[in-house]
Amino acid sequence: MSAQNGYEWQQTERDVWTRTCLGHEAAASFNENIAYGHTELSVTATFRVHHPASSGIAGTDQEQEDLVARVRDAWIRTRYLRPEVAVEMTTHTDASIPQAFTYRVLRDEVSLRRWVDQTMAVVRLGEPGAESLEEVCAYTYNRALPTPGKQSMLYLVLPRLADEKDRNAHFVWNVSHALADGGSISELYNVLLQAMIDASPSTDGSVYIPSDQELDVLPLLPRSVVAAYRQQHKPSAADEEAAAETARDNLRLIQAKMNESLALQPVTNWTTRKHETICIRRDIEADEARELIKFGKHIKSGVTYLASAATVLATAETFPERKASSTGALMGMVRNARRWLSTEPVEGATGNRTPLGSDAVFLWIPVDTQKSLEPSFDGVPELVSVAARIRSELNKHLVSPHCISSYPVVAEFAQGALTNHWAEIEGANRSAHTPNAEELSKIIGPQAPGFSSVGALQVHSRFEPASPSARASGLWLERTDSAHRGRQVNASPWISMLMIDGKIKLQLGFDAKFHDADKMEQWMQRTYEWLLVCAAAASSSVGTVAPISARL
């Protein structure tokens, strides 16, 4: 097998497919292994199955039993329609050995039942450990995936017993970042929820058995964006070297600018603290979101750039100890390679599904730090100016698909850096003497702010059965909410944003070993209030008002 073919799926034995990870999927899997599950995602969806009145099961125990059976069968079917949920990953931390994926085709009921037992859990609100959806989510993002090979895990969260006001159920999809990003979350949920409403649970307790067509998983197995790019764009050696040099330039930028950058300041006593992921969320309701979008259009800037600029300015005021000596900010920004890839298989490809397309680049953004950067109408011109700079700098990294050629180089560097970094962290944690502040700052120093725009989450709000008779009966599924959170086991928290149902949702996950919750709350609140100021500026005369953060 050639090295290149090793990055495509190969059948190594009957019903077993394997391939070597390539690019950021390799780095993501390795990062999860060495950092106790760092970046594993917990993505929620809230829904209700509406049964026809003639069924007579609404509000009964039978309704809940039907729901569990539907979800079980839909989860099995999704195993074949979106096979990444059942892909197993290597779990080693040896950077010299490639990360790899394995997918096993299961055909019999015994194997499928065993897989469901390993990867699906049913909990009910009100039970111990499940007082709220947030508590269930917190459980999932405060431990690494427990499934064999880090396969996805699906939690079905049932409503409280006898709660007549809220009969909604919830999903928490817990998944490796090596196999999902903001762009592919929607695709998974659309498949899973449709499979739910299409399900016809058996009355004898047997489970769904995939059809022969569904068992043909090769066209649907997840490809690396690097492999898909190489096949579609056929980069030359010069393209690959230019991309690698651009990536090295980006690493040099971080080294050159960190000392003069606005930054998050980790705690100095982190060796005495335990890892704990805390997720902070803020929602901008639909009316204010419309005003924010309106403001962005007026100044010819997208909400992504306004929100990333708000993140920078919020950093300055939350960590003022860096402000006086800073001339700007290193800013981490996410981009997505799928913008350059065909959504249909190109000639010679068995499939073109690439559930992980995102990566990050760092930008240098000059900021006038000699003024107040608290949220206020007076500060809007500075925010708009910073947003324009971010857009201009990011666009330099969006000009050519050949940047994808750099992903294997960056991933290899990342795995080496992570190995060294975690050796230093664990060494400091185990040290017989307490390292001094200077020693600790060499291991965990100031952190550049980062922003990840997931974009619009295109999960449908209504699902009807494919069967005409089932549809005619009045059976349907309503999806009413969705959100995302993630496990954080490092010192570099990022703020992320998505839009769904007209709302804009901000999320900040951080590791309490390295950051104080109060500081993270302030950082998120300032970012959020900057966006509210922009929304208000869309329909108000912009005058001088006191900084909103004065009311924190």
Curated annotation (Swiss-Prot):
Induction: Expression is induced when cells are grown in cultures containing vegetable oil as the carbon source. The keyword Signal does not apply. Coiled coil: none annotated. Gene3D superfamilies: Chloramphenicol acetyltransferase-like domain (3.30.559.10), Nonribosomal peptide synthetase, condensation domain (3.30.559.30). Keywords: Acyltransferase, Transferase. Pathway: Secondary metabolite biosynthesis. The keyword Disulfide bond does not apply. It is an enzyme of class 2 (transferase). Its EC number is 2.-.-.-. MELs not only have high potential as eco-friendly biosurfactants due to their excellent surface activity, but also have attracted considerable recent interest because of thei runique properties, including self-assembly, anti-tumor and cell differentiation induction activities, and moisturizing and hair-repairing properties. GO terms for molecular function: acyltransferase activity. InterPro entries: CAT-like_dom_sf (IPR023213). Acyl-CoA-dependent acyltransferase; part of the gene cluster that mediates the biosynthesis of mannosylerythritol lipids (MELs), surface-active substances that enhance the availability of water-insoluble substrates. Belongs to the trichothecene O-acetyltransferase family. This is Acyl-CoA-dependent acyltransferase MAC1. It comes from Pseudozyma antarctica (strain T-34) (Yeast).
